[in-house]
Every structure is written in C-alpha cells, then in structure tokens.
Amino acid sequence: FINYRDAYGSLIVKKHLAGNDINPDDEFTFCINLNDDSINTTFGGVEFIRGTATVDIKGNESLTINGIPHGTNYTVTERDYRGEGYETTSINETGTISENNPAIVEFTNTRNTYGDLIVHKRLAGNAANRDQRFLFTVTLSDTTISDKFGDMIFENGVAKFELSGGESKKAVSLPNGITYKVVEDDYSSLGYVTTKTHDTGTITGNEEIEAIFTNTRDTYGSLEVSKVLTGNDVDTNK
C-alpha cells in the first residue's frame, strides 16, 4: 500500500504605510509569481495564469492566499511608486511556501512631504513708525519640534521673533499636516489697527503659506484759519 498526502501552505502579503503624507484609501498593485509557469489555477480566490497573479491591496491591509502547494517558490514585487513620492522597503519578498508556517511578505511605503510658512510684516498709514519692532509668536501643533527651520528657531513647537515693517521670516520644511497659529503682540495702545491673513492654518506638503500682518496708524491735526484786516478804512462787518 502506498499512501499519498498533499501538503499546502499560505502566502500572506501585508501592506504598510508610513509618513506624514499618506492616504489609507490608496491601493497598491502587486505581482505574485509562483516561479512555475505550469500553474493555471485559483488559490484562495486569487487567479494565477502561468504561475503569475496581479492583486491590489490597500494601505495597512493584507491579502491571504491559501492552498498553495508546499515547496512552491514565490516572488512578490510591488509596482514602482517612487514617482508618487513613496519610498518602499520589503521583507521576505522571495521564499518558499511551507505547510507548517505561512509565508509572510511585508511591504512598507513611506511618504513624507514638507511645506513652508512665511510671516510678513507690513505697515500703512501716515504715522507708522518704520523703525518699530513687532513681536510675533508662531505655535505649531507638533510640540516635539525643537530645531531651526529656515529663519525660525522652534522650541517645543513655538518660535518667537521680531519684525519691522517690510521684513519677513520664513520657516522651511515643516511637516505636512501639522497646524500653525501666528500671533502678533497687541499694539493698539500705540494707535495701530492690525489686519491679518492666513494667521492660522495647516501646513501642506510642497506648498508655501504666507501669513501677512498689516499694521495701520494714522494721525490727524486741526487747521485754524483766521482773517486779519489792516488799514484805516476797513469794514469789520465783512
């Protein structure tokens, strides 16, 4: 008597996303090659033609393929997403299917993008002091940021600096997705009226945001007009 037993194993492909600029709804295309072009069948709902199958997997999801014959060699490759800003690392992308332990393949795509923030100081009005220094505070939602970014030095997500009229400071390479708030000290006691644009918002990768603060100060005087008559024959009633 000769007894035969077929053995099968599983292949699990996991897709991970990392970085500050990712979309969990994005799908990523994979090619699974079983290194045997005689395989024309379906394993675990995945159809293989001449030993090759193409599948799409969303970020942070996985695909399990059961019923692959024990001892089958495999190679998993992901489409090249460098053009979309992703850097890809992989683990166990090649190997052999085993009956006892599933083959686990992991791909991690990382994408980080960065944006810039510029704070402008402008003056207007007939009594603005061009030598006046104005104090600003920039607060980021990420309190772990403590470093120099362009013209701004942050400590625990906060940067302070002074600007005169016509000057600006630029923070470069701030992480995509963090929020910011720019506050100028109150100078109303000096007669300034302040208007501002984009003083709060969210940093967007590969974009530049301009926060503009305009302080206006006008002063006004009075004009008195008097009429003086001279001579020995004037009419004071005129």
Report the location of each language-model feature.
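Solvent-exposed loop/turn and edge beta-strand elements of beta-rich ligand-binding domains
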Residues: 1-238
